[in-house]
Amino acid sequence: MATINQLVRKGRKRRVAKSNVPALEASPQKRGVCTRVYTTTPKKPNSALRKVARVRLTNNYEVSSYIGGEGHNLQEHSVVLIRGGRVKDLPGVRYHVVRGAADTAGVDKRRQGRSKYGAKRPKS
């Protein structure tokens, strides 16, 4: 415990908050180009083939980013928009591809939660 005299001399140190999404550099989204599109398997106890893209951003960071939704049209050299948000069962994947922005198509035949997958309103 610090004495009052020590606190007068030094003061308390502020804790520095560490970002979970450093590659965004305090932006809401960043644009990038896919360098590799592949599937990978999640950690135990889950089992699937998760779709992931390796993306080279405009600020020269290279990050892994998850492609949500059923089916996608991404390949190497596709331009994508990424946002923050990690995937808990894929280590090292801390970003999501924004569906329906840049070269990424929205999920077709999507009826609920459409805004999260870039799907237009169906013609009833």
Swiss-Prot record:
The keyword Zinc-finger does not apply. Keywords: Methylation, Ribonucleoprotein, Ribosomal protein, RNA-binding, rRNA-binding, tRNA-binding. One of its GO terms (biological process) is translation. One of its GO terms (cellular component) is small ribosomal subunit. InterPro entries: NA-bd_OB-fold, Ribosomal_uS12, Ribosomal_uS12_bac. Residues 1-29, 101-124 are annotated as: Disordered. Pfam families: Ribosom_S12_S23. Residues 111-124 have a biased composition (Basic residues). One of its GO terms (molecular function) is tRNA binding. Part of the 30S ribosomal subunit. Contacts proteins S8 and S17. May interact with IF1 in the 30S initiation complex. With S4 and S5 plays an important role in translational accuracy. Interacts with and stabilizes bases of the 16S rRNA that are involved in tRNA selection in the A site and with the mRNA backbone. Located at the interface of the 30S and 50S subunits, it traverses the body of the 30S subunit contacting proteins on the other side and probably holding the rRNA structure together. The combined cluster of proteins S8, S12 and S17 appears to hold together the shoulder and platform of the 30S subunit. Belongs to the universal ribosomal protein uS12 family. This is Small ribosomal subunit protein uS12.
